[in-house]
Curated annotation (Swiss-Prot):
Protein name as annotated: Gas vesicle protein J
Subcellular location field: Gas vesicle
Leader peptide range in chain numbering: none
Source organism of this protein record: Priestia megaterium
Gene transcribed to yield this protein: gvpJ
Main localisation: other
Biotechnology annotation for this entry: The minimal pNL29 gvp locus overexpressed in E.coli can be filled with Xe and used as a contrast agent for ultrasound and magnetic resonance imaging. Engineered gas vesicles (GV) can be used for noninvasive imaging in E.coli and mice. Heterologous GVs with 2 copies of gvpA plus gvpC from D.flosaquae and the gvpR-gvpU operon from this bacterium make GVs suitable for imaging of bacteria deep in mouse tissues (e.g. the gastrointestinal tract), or when expressed in tumor-homing bacteria, can be detected in tumors.
Keywords associated with the record: Gas vesicle
Lineage of producing organism: Bacteria, Bacillati, Bacillota, Bacilli, Bacillales
Top-level taxon of origin: Bacteria
Length: 100
């Protein structure tokens, strides 16, 4: 009688699909020191996930980054316009005060 083994194999595509679907967080610290004197500490925090999963957990920084998104560039233009309008308002208020 032959014994059957249920061998499941995963391809790299299957593994990547699971990782992107669920997400993976990798955290680590690297410390360089001499004689109990800490010279350098590097904190590494890495998340690997699909865009949908990242948005689901609240990570959407790339949507407003002016270097990565047209929305971000629009926000930069709005900030500049807002700053200019504040300066203009301040100038007008000062002119009104001097006329009193």
């Amino acid at each position: 009688m032959a014994v059957e083994h249920n061998m499941q194999s995963s391809t790299i595509v299957d593994v990547l699909e699971k990782i992107l679907d669920k997400g993976v967080v990798i955290a680590g610290d690297i410390t360089v020191g001499i004689a109990d004197v800490e010279l350098l500490t590097i904190k590494i925090r890495l998340i690997v996930a699909s865009v949908d999963k990242a948005k689901e957990i609240g990570m959407d920084w790339w949507e407003n980054d002016p270097y990565l998104s047209s929305k971000g560039a629009n926000n930069k233009a709005l900030e500049e316009e807002n700053k200019m309008l504040h300066e203009r308002l301040k100038t007008l208020e000062e002119k009104i005060e001097t006329k009193r």
